[in-house]
Amino acid sequence: MFSLQNLCRKTLPDRKLPEFFDDYVLQLLGLYWENHGTIQRAGNNCVLIQQHNLIPVNEALRIAASEENYEIVSLLLAWEGNLYYAIIGALEGNRHNLIRKYDDQIKDHHEILPFIDDPVIFHKCHMMRRCFFNCILYQAVKYSKFSVLLYFKYILKENLPLVHSLIEKACEDHNYEVIKWIYENLHIYEIMDTFKCAIAHKDLHLYSLGYTFIYNRIVPYKYHHLDIRILSRLQLLHKVTAKGYLDFILETLKYDHNKDNINIILTQAATYNHRNILTYFIPQSTYAQIEQCLFVAIKTNASKKTLNLLLSHLNLSIKLVKKLSQYVVAYKSTNIISILSMQQKKKIYLDIILTKVVKNAIFIKFVIGCMVTFSINPERIVKMAARIKKMKLVKNISEHVWKNHAAKLKHLKHAVHTMKHQEGKNRLMNFIYDHCYYHMQGEEIFSLARFYAIHHAPKLFDVFYDCCILDTIRFKSLLLDCSYIIAKNAHDASINIVNKYIGNLFAMGVLSKKEILQDYPSIYSKDYML
């Protein structure tokens, strides 16, 4: 470290520190700067030249280096001058020897650049790093060196991709002044870079700045009627709503006056489950807009909370549920079914939805998924399918849910028993005959015959025939039981079937005329005995 006391002891004749430093003493001490005069340290950051001129130590160091005055440079470095200024001065004076002397002490020449305003020196310093050309412009943006950007202005005008990369860099650094300079001096008309960076970094100030550029540079005042087309093309409202940036949306609406904006906001907010945005804009929306938003939410499989929020602003009615059912089927959304199952009229609403699902069911997995998720009895789905002639779905459900023959037969018979729709019942009973009858044994066949008689099955005649073949004596008893059931219900088609088999048994000698008159008086027709 430089010590004035030690210097005096080594240099002055009496080796004492003088009370006053005149020019002669300072020259003896070597504190003399050629062409400038004596030099003294004044405080921590300044030096005194010729006893009266006070300048910063780093400024003195820069000047000394530009003059290649090694002694003064060494002295000022000892006085805690910044080595970077010595390099800057050497570059200004093209003092390559001095640069070589101190260059190995510089770890990264980029660190010198913030201290340089002259674009030529800035460029020279950067070349010492042997870095690619674009880097110098990135550094100019980083440190807001407008003089450097201006120096390379004509190069930039010919290289728009480079300009856009500089804009992105400035946006990332939130360097608004540089962004302004680029747009104002290079006349850039592609504004999307600024908006992209603003959205990516959630920088509202930068986002607002983008609109300022549009109105001040791209769309002159007399052409402001073009702003709708320009802003719509940018689709900024779509982007910021998808991100959930409410403050960005409000900023956008200050400039973008498209009549479809509310629809865009609601659609995007529902799609991405941004309930804060929905809460803000729903009060400003029409009933039709909210309804359409709900359909979009179902289409995009929005969360239950989002669906609940939208439903809370609508009048839940059968008409609306019918509309919802179309979207449930089309987009296989189950969240809305879950919500409807919690409503006061849940049975009505669920029936509407499930009927639509069953009617349009293509993928068995979705129907089964609904049954499992909402604990829906498979028999309910089977009855719906039978009612609307979806027998393939009945087959798929019964095979998937009821793995063994006994369980399948039990549940299908119960579905028939609890079903009111007669055509649907008939289809189910035909289905049992077509898909379960083959696996039945004697007892099951007789039981099915009795069941068919109760419900007037179209296949009753065929089952009676098999029973008669299997065991004629037992069939005689079955026929007697069934005759009482059928007579009680007065079902003409079934009565005709029983009468025919009474006649057959009479012809076979199994039944006598006396037995017929005694046991079957209510349904007996002597025409079958002829």
Swiss-Prot record:
Pfam families: DUF249 (PF03158)
InterPro entries per the UniProt record, alphabetical: MGF_505
Family: Belongs to the asfivirus MGF 505 family.
Its job: Plays a role in virus cell tropism, and may be required for efficient virus replication in macrophages.
This protein's name: Protein MGF 505-1R
